[in-house]
Amino acid sequence: MPRSPLKKLLLLGGSHAEIPLIQAAQSLGWYVITTGNNRDGLGHSYADKTVFADFSNKDAMLELARSEDVQAVCSGCNDFALLSTVYVCEKLGLPGHDSYATSLEIHHKDKYRALAARLGIPTPKANSVRGEHEFDTALSNLTFPIIVKPVDLTGGKGIHRAANPEEARIAYKDACSRTREDHIVVEEFVQGSNHGFSAMLVKGKVAFAFADNEQYFMNKYLVSGANTPSASGGETLAKLRDYSERIARELHLVDGILHIQYIEKADGTPVIIEICRRPPGDLYIKFVKYATGVDYPKTIVMAETGEDISGIADVPTQGYWLRHCIMAGPDIANGSTVRDVTFAPEIQGNIVEKFLWCKPGETIADTLLYKAGIVFFRFGSLAEMHDKTARMTELAKIITA
């Protein structure tokens, strides 16, 4: 049955990552309009209407929201989408979002590092760099290895680890070529295990929290998978709740998601390396729903449209789960042709859902970024989860012609 266009929601994004948000919004009665530059985005076909436009252009998004006369705007799984969303909502007086200035404090890496230092939250020692002179000063202030990254990009784009000044200068030029800002951030490398922590804030308190263990494959700065329950202990997770609430109090954050990526050091200290107030990508919000039973996509849409989410239950992970992105292995070269994706017999019984979008005959342009799809697995024990996760890139493989 078609939804009435009287209750219209603009969603900034239309990739596979936004599909759970589109479906959740529609289940809440919204007529969903998606936008974005990518005409091949898999999410657009799920929407009630699509208007192709650049969601990173906040004034274009404001004009689109006005012309469509929408009653709500939701961010897709991208920081540019989030910043445009909060800008539009601030201009139109729509609910569910922080101010544009507050959002910059969280989503621009240099501003967040300064905030964390002010609040006593562990964060990598970092310098904001404008120009080569400041870059040289940063190198003298920091201990190698260092990480060089744009302040405004996610998904591992433009991030490099440098072991010496020569590598650092190459990394600096690449980061500068990618950013839309006039500066980048340079920070000390933190040694430890990588994790995610996703919280739902209600009145400045963590009302729900979920944690995972991250996996990386060929691209060391792009998450290729996550499993749960997290290996982080109760004390570490309690610190993350406390840090989240410190940030919420300081910035007067509205109710809704606060998502964190952190490195846990050997002593259990969680060092926050990325933070955002928009849904994580690659169907992570569906992963949370599978693992806890909490309808995370629906809760996110409710929060972003100004509805009450105080009824959310703080449910722990139920069982042993993996969300795995099917990516190209070391035996596959750029320009290879996809033939199939295969799954070993021993994991067939663990598969809960397969969402494959690759097509036989398509070309893999960049092996470090190419994804054939996403698969959700459930395991019978913690040991099975860890064993099969460690071998998953061999158990689920892209086959090329």
Model-assigned labels for residue ranges:
Residues L258, T299, A344-P360:
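A structural supersecondary motif
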Residues M1-T102, H133, G306-S310, P316-T317, ...:
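ATP-binding N-terminal substructure of ATP-dependent carboxylate-amine bond-forming enzymes
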Residues T305-G349:
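A glycine-rich beta-turn/hairpin centered on an aromatic-Pro dipeptide
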Residues G268-P270:
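Conserved protein kinase catalytic/activation segment
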Residues S103-V185, Q191, V202-K205, S230-D242, ...:
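Active-site nucleotide/adenylate-binding loops and adjacent lid/helix of ATP-dependent enzymes
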